[in-house]
């Protein structure tokens, strides 16, 4: 064990812990209330001889590190975070993507748009002001001495300096949370503003880097885009966000002026996110065929695991595989036609009306957020009865087209949950 001067406890806790834990591999010591104590513990790979000499050496090295931290902290505090931000004009974000200062300008627009989307138009002026301010200051700590020396403290020092500058706690916390999750399994943003800034930062990084043709291949991912994309996916899932991936990409494309590449960018990002979602589903133990069934549409990211869980529950239910067969039967016919408006006046058999009613009941249950399994089981029975009693390809062209349109409408609705043709049946 060893100790250091109490004066260093005036530094932000992470500024003391980081050089101690990450650089020297020492264990910090905390009081019962969680406050940091001026002491540390180390592990020696050897005997007990000369432990006092070893401890003294450890203390000397740590004091030098803490003295550096104190110096950088004092120098950094000679300017406000807003003043530090000006230096971002000289820091390149990425080749071809301008400066970090320009990035913060984009983040101001992106974060504000996300906050407005999350609030569904019920955002007050204070929340929007916080969104702009958090994004404006989000990268300012990157040019401070403390973060230059201890890069692990990015965002953390931004939070501390923002608080010392008198910024709102919401702004300060968001500056820290923008980098979450910092590693696999780490904490996700817990505040709405932190979520918004983090999502904005990640989608800006992904779209910007992709626009320069720097899409990760194989084991090469120099900009950590896979980790950021996975973080974005996990955030959207945890928040049960109704935010669409395509809307995020559109916002980023607007800010990068990528109009002619917009459609391609949507495809690239969706494919990239799809792979991250596949990883998430695999880790949750979702069957591989169920994964394929639900990953066709990943626009509403948070809904993908929900749909996967539903399909697995459907398969596990009594008659589940037969139900899937019924759904697949509809798709086998419907996907080769364009479909049109269904006219009940053209129904010739009562099974047609029964099928329409069963479909409407299932659609209504879904719209109301009810458990749709009972109504979809009823729909499956109606489908089987329909095919047993009705010849779809009627001699009357209008009747035939009406029946095909009915099947097309049902299949389109089922596809919103899953492509059941991907399911492997016993």
Task: Describe these PLM feature segments.
Residues 1-426:
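Amphipathic alpha-helical "coupling" segments that flank catalytic cores
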């Amino acid at each position: 064990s060893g100790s250091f001067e109490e004066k260093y406890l005036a530094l932000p806790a992470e500024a003391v812990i980081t050089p101690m834990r990450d650089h020297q591999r020492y264990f910090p010591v905390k009081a019962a209330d969680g406050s940091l104590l001026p002491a540390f513990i180390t592990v020696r790979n050897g005997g007990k001889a000369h432990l006092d000499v070893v401890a003294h050496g450890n203390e000397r090295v740590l004091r030098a590190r803490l003295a550096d931290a104190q110096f950088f902290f004092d120098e950094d505090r000679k300017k406000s975070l807003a003043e530090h931000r000006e230096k971002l004009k000289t820091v390149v974000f990425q080749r071809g993507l301008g400066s970090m200062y320009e990035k913060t300008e984009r983040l101001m627009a992106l974060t504000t748009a996300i906050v407005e989307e999350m609030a569904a138009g019920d955002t007050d002026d204070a929340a929007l002001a916080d969104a702009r301010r958090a994004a404006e200051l989000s990268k300012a700590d990157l040019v401070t001495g403390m973060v230059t020396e201890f890069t692990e403290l990015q965002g953390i020092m931004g939070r501390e300096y923002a608080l010392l500058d008198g910024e709102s706690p919401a702004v300060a916390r968001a500056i820290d949370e923008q980098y979450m999750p910092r590693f696999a399994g780490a904490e996700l943003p817990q505040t709405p503003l932190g979520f918004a800034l983090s999502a904005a930062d990640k989608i800006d990084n992904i779209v910007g880097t992709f626009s320069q043709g720097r899409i990760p291949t194989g084991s090469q991912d120099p900009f950590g885009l896979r980790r950021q994309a996975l973080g974005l996916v996990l955030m959207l899932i945890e928040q049960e966000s109704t935010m669409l991936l395509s809307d995020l990409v559109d916002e980023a494309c607007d800010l990068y002026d990528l109009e002619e590449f917009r459609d391609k960018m949507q495809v690239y990002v969706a494919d990239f996110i799809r792979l991250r979602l596949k990883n998430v589903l695999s880790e949750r133990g979702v069957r591989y065929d169920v994964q394929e069934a639900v990953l066709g549409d990943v626009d509403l990211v948070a809904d993908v695991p929900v749909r996967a869980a539903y399909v697995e529950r459907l398969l596990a239910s009594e008659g589940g595989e037969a139900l899937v067969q019924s759904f697949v039967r509809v798709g086998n016919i419907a996907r080769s036609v364009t479909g049109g408006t269904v006219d009940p006046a053209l129904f010739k058999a009562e099974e047609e009306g029964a099928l329409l009613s069963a479909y409407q009941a299932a659609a209504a249950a879904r719209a109301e957020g009810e458990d749709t399994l009972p109504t979809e089981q009823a729909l499956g029975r109606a489908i089987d009865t329909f095919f047993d009693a009705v010849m779809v390809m009627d001699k009357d062209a209008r009747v035939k087209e009406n029946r095909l349109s009915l099947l097309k409408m049902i299949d389109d609705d089922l596809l919103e949950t899953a492509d059941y043709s991907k399911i492997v049946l016993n």
